[in-house]
A protein has these predicted regions:
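Conserved short hydrophobic patches within well-ordered secondary structure
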Residues: 136-140, 179, 233
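Short linear capping/connector segments at secondary-structure termini
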Residues: 210-214
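Terminal targeting/low-complexity segments that flank the catalytic cores of oxidoreductases
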Residues: 1-163, 168-173, 198-205, 209, ...
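Alpha-helical transition-metal enzyme core signature, strongest for iron centers
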Residues: 151-159, 178-196, 231-232
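Acidic/serine-rich, low-complexity amphipathic helices located in mid- to C-terminal regulatory regions
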Residues: 224-233
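Active-site lining segments of carbohydrate-active enzymes
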Residues: 215-220
Length: 233
């Protein structure tokens, strides 16, 4: 019996509870490379099945990398040193640089929060989902808040990844540059959260798939993988 047939015969309440687990299982079994599956397995269990990002409490993710200290403080990467100097000179303050007094009314049809054609409501109507103009406006607002919430959660992951890279990288100029990346990601977290909190007044939970990526990066011992993941997020 396939999954679809099984879901069809289940009572509605039971189906709504077990459906996310079947979807999570499909995601995990879609990974064909056994090495990738093994590396993502623990994070997938914590994110997709246990839903550690949706329990309403801070999440503890064990780190396995080593912090690399160099007590001679060498100047060992001229390119990184140059990036560090540029990053210092280009710092900006999100609290001061952005005009937070700008009024944002997500329900104002005259100033849509996202383009009206961003969502194909005609396609939804083909499936029997018909919304009033007010419902369409609210739906666009909710979609925007959800997307920005995931950006925010991703930036928190990038913030922690940058901090871990700074600890684990083995050339000292890279650590100096990494410190500026930590500040950059902190600024992103600050700005995204403030916009969601003061303008949209809504924050969605972290997406399970995004949690898996963040969990896998945080617990990976390789600094270069953390650096790559930081750029992706």
């Amino acid at each position: 019996m396939n999954t679809d047939k099984l879901m069809d015969i289940l009572p509605e309440k039971v189906r709504s509870r077990v459906e996310p687990y079947f979807e999570a299982l499909e995601v995990m079994t879609a990974v064909k490379d056994p090495k990738v599956a093994a590396s993502l397995g623990p994070a997938s269990v914590r994110g997709l099945f246990l839903q550690r990002g949706k329990q309403g409490v801070p999440t503890k993710i064990p780190a396995s990398h080593e912090a690399y200290f160099d007590w001679t403080y060498p100047s060992d990467q001229p390119e990184m040193l140059d990036l560090y100097r540029r990053a210092k000179a280009a710092q900006w303050d999100g609290e001061e640089r952005l005009d937070w007094s700008t009024s944002v009314d997500p329900h104002d049809p005259e100033v849509p929060i996202i383009p009206e054609n961003f969502i194909n409501f005609e396609k939804l109507a083909d499936y029997g989902i018909k919304l009033t103009p007010q419902e369409k406006t609210r739906f666009r607002t909710d979609i925007t808040a959800w997307q920005l919430s995931q950006f925010l959660h991703g930036e928190q992951g990038a913030l922690f990844a940058a901090a871990q890279v700074t600890e684990a990288v083995q050339f000292f100029d890279g650590k100096l540059y990494g410190a500026t990346q930590v500040v950059d990601e902190a600024r992103h977290v600050e700005v995204f959260h403030r916009y969601l909190d003061t303008k949209l007044n809504k924050l969605y939970q972290v997406n399970d798939n995004l949690f898996v990526i963040i969990d896998a990066l945080m617990s990976d011992s390789r600094w270069d993988m953390k650096f790559l993941g930081m750029q992706i997020m």
